[in-house]
From Swiss-Prot:
Protein name: Malate dehydrogenase
Residues involved in substrate binding: R94, R100, N133, R164
GO BP annotation list: malate metabolic process; tricarboxylic acid cycle
Source species of the chain: Deinococcus deserti (strain DSM 17065 / CIP 109153 / LMG 22923 / VCD115)
Family stated for the protein in its record: Belongs to the LDH/MDH superfamily. MDH type 2 family.
Superkingdom of source: Bacteria
Annotated HAMAP family: Malate_dehydrog_2
Amino acid sequence: MTNKQPVRVAVTGAAGQIGYSLLFRIAAGDMLGKDQPVILQLLEITPALKALQGVVMELRDGAYPLLADVVTSDDPLVAFKDADYALLVGAMPRKAGMERGDLLGANGGIFKPQGQALNQVASRDVKVLVVGNPANTNALIAQQNAPDLDPRQFTAMVRLDHNRAISQLAEKTGQPVSAIKNITIWGNHSSTQYPDLSQATVGGRPALDLVDRTWYEQEYIPTVAKRGAAIIEARGASSAASAASAAIDHMRDWALGTSEGEWVSMGIPSDGSYGVPEGLIYGFPVTVKDGKYQIVQGLEISEFSRGKMDATARELEEERDEIRKLGLIS
């Protein structure tokens, strides 16, 4: 067993589909390591608190040695109190006929108060991952409403796209996913994202030597970008288990570090690297050491890549301008 003090992990939307796939894995130590006890602090909207109690009963019935305690609330000031990690999963899904502005406005009503609550009561070193879509811009809303925290503490999940990109390439090349290194997802977690294979390797060989350029540009990129829609079409519901798994991967790498010589994709505040407008929450290739991420520098950007990277940046700028107009950020 462990002598480590428990850390506090806040999860919003905890009674939802992704929450249900996520909480048991956090309790089992998949996210922060098999020697790190956790206190789960679960936030839900008032009507979902009863369902959340059922999830808590199951968490307790799992008798997880690492699960030190579970707190539930419909108040972010309770759920985020002293949180070391916060996974913001709960969001307003897009409904038929909704314009992007409507969706951003509805989510602003969630992420603005959550940013303010994190600012008020979370640990000063809290690591925040926004999973709820539109994740990049929801992360920006939360971040801009938490002025006392370092902007770099707010990240958005592009790891699901990253994992999808790995698995599609593995399938195409007939190699195990473990053979694939250094794929990058640039930009927004949306259909404008750019899954970039220009630096990727498969078993040490350049990925683009192993696949056809036409397949890469015309099939691979759209397949990865539209995978979420394909899952809804097939399953009748959005991806939940794979999203939870990606959230675990993102937080584990942020907390425990990336492997030597490898990078992963994280949605993080741009510092202007690669000509991406500063301040946007944008997918970049990063390495992590001692809980701090760094953008991988010095990668060659082709004309094709530049066009894709700029297009997804433009979409994020439009979303930022929209939330500014709505008064969600200044």
